Every structure is written in C-alpha cells, then in structure tokens.
Amino acid sequence: MRASYKKLWKLLVDKDMSKGNLHKASGLSSSTMTKLRKGEDVSMEALRKICICLGCNIGDIVEFVDESK
C-alpha cells in the first residue's frame, strides 16, 4: 500500500489555494513539498501541519492505495 495525495491536490483546488501558498502557510520544508508532489511518504507531523493549515482531517488529504491492483 502506498499513500496517495490526490485528495490534497483536489482540496487545494476547491479552496483556491496554490501549492506555493500551502508551502508558505503550513511552514513545510521544500523537501517535504517535493515528496508530496512525487507521492512519496512524509511524516505525520507534516500531515498534521497541512491539516491545521487547511482546517481538515488527515482522511481529507491522504488515502492509501493498494499497488497490487
């Protein structure tokens, strides 16, 4: 299973917020933003910062996808 951040990108569109604005508002590092863009694993702390910034829950920004399908 791998993490998918498609929900995060859709939420940003819905909130009319750019990835750059999320980066600044959440205080995430550039390397964490790059990991998110590449669909790589990020820390729970990074996900917590995003949730606080967007006023949402973790299930609103990430889902786990079965790679075997």
Where are the model-predicted features located?
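The alpha-helix within a helix-turn-helix
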Residues: L12, H23, R37, C51
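Short amphipathic recognition helices of helix-turn-helix/homeodomain-type DNA-binding modules
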Residues: I61-K69
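Short alpha-helical DNA-recognition segment
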Residues: D16-T34
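A short, Lys/Arg-rich alpha-helix, primarily the initiator
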Residues: M1-G20
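Hydrophobic micro-packing sites on short alpha-helices
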Residues: K49-C51, I61-V62
